[in-house]
Swiss-Prot record:
GO terms for biological process: negative regulation of cell division. It comes from the Bacteria. Gene3D superfamilies: P-loop containing nucleotide triphosphate hydrolases (3.40.50.300). The gene is bcsQ. Keywords: ATP-binding, Cytoplasm, Nucleotide-binding. One of its GO terms (cellular component) is cytosol. Belongs to the BcsQ family. This is Cellulose biosynthesis protein BcsQ. The keyword ATP-binding applies. Its main location: cytoplasm. Essential for cellulose biosynthesis. May play a role in subcellular localization of an active cellulose biosynthesis apparatus at the bacterial cell pole. PANTHER family: CELLULOSE BIOSYNTHESIS PROTEIN BCSQ-RELATED (PTHR43384:SF4), SEPTUM SITE-DETERMINING PROTEIN MIND HOMOLOG, CHLOROPLASTIC-RELATED (PTHR43384). InterPro entries: Cellulose_synthase_operon_BcsQ, P-loop_NTPase, ParA/MinD_ATPase. It comes from Salmonella typhi.
């Protein structure tokens, strides 16, 4: 099994929707998947038909001294969700007070990996370098850095470090945009970790969260859903290749 983290090069690049879409695609391919919201924004739940008023989550449980396992939700027989949970306004104002407490989730994720219950654990990681985020990134076997082809992300790719070994995944690529086409050609020449897969702009991606469903469940025939399914297959092949390479060294 593998732990896969998805993190935006900046905020607002569609990381949460992509995480939900990839989780759905992997379970369509027969994988057992746990998707974990690691962002205090607590938005991943909205892609899995969880009530807006639901405040529970692994972080909320740890902060309240409860068992984080009780926060897990079943979506399909092969797809489970672990929301972050809702923070209070006081907790938002003083994140240093709870970062250490939430660090306990690291050992929990390692135990889940060791159990073999899931083929994949997907982490929806927030943008930034908080202590908790750094800890979770260090647990990942693979990391996808999500970027949109714009000047903002172009600058960031040259001035901020990506997680070690991260692959860059382009999201929301617009057909007919001269600027995006120009930047994309530059990236093809300069970004060696660029994935050979892109996710094109698709209205279904925006609509699926409004419908509280993962992309592939909402519109399996959409272009973006087909591209995410291709991404899921790439993840399976890439993970299998890494394990084969590791085994050959022993």
């Amino acid at each position: 099994m593998a732990i896969l983290g998805l993190q935006g090069v900046r905020g607002g690049v569609g990381t949460t929707s992509l995480t939900a879409a990839l989780a759905w695609a992997l379970q369509i391919l027969g994988e057992n998947v746990l998707v974990i919201d690691a962002s205090p924004d607590n938005l991943l739940r909205m892609s899995f038909n969880v009530d807006f008023v639901h405040q529970g989550g692994w972080a909320r449980s740890l902060l309240d001294g409860q068992d984080w396992r009780d926060a897990g939700l079943r979506y399909t027989s092969q797809l489970d969700l672990l929301p972050f949970g809702q923070l209070t306004s006081q907790e938002w104002e003083n994140p240093q007070a709870w970062q250490e407490t939430l660090g306990e989730i690291g050992s929990a994720i390692q135990a889940l990996k060791a159990s073999g219950r899931y083929s994949w654990i997907l982490l929806d990681l927030p943008y930034g370098e908080s202590p908790l985020t750094r800890q979770l990134v260090s647990l990942c076997d693979h990391t996808l850095a999500i970027a949109q082809v714009d000047a903002n992300c172009h600058i960031r790719l040259h001035q901020q470090a990506l997680p070690a070994g991260a692959h860059i995944l382009i999201n929301d690529l617009r057909i007919g945009s001269q600027l995006q086409d120009d930047l994309y050609q530059v990236w093809l020449q300069s970004q060696r970790r660029l994935l050979p897969i892109v996710i094109h702009r698709d209205e279904a991606m925006a609509e699926c969260m409004a419908s509280k469903q993962p992309l592939g469940e909402y519109r399996s025939d959409s272009l973006a859903a087909e591209e995410v399914l291709t991404l899921a297959n790439w993840c399976l092949l890439h993970d299998a290749g890494d394990k084969t390479s590791a085994g050959s060294l022993r």
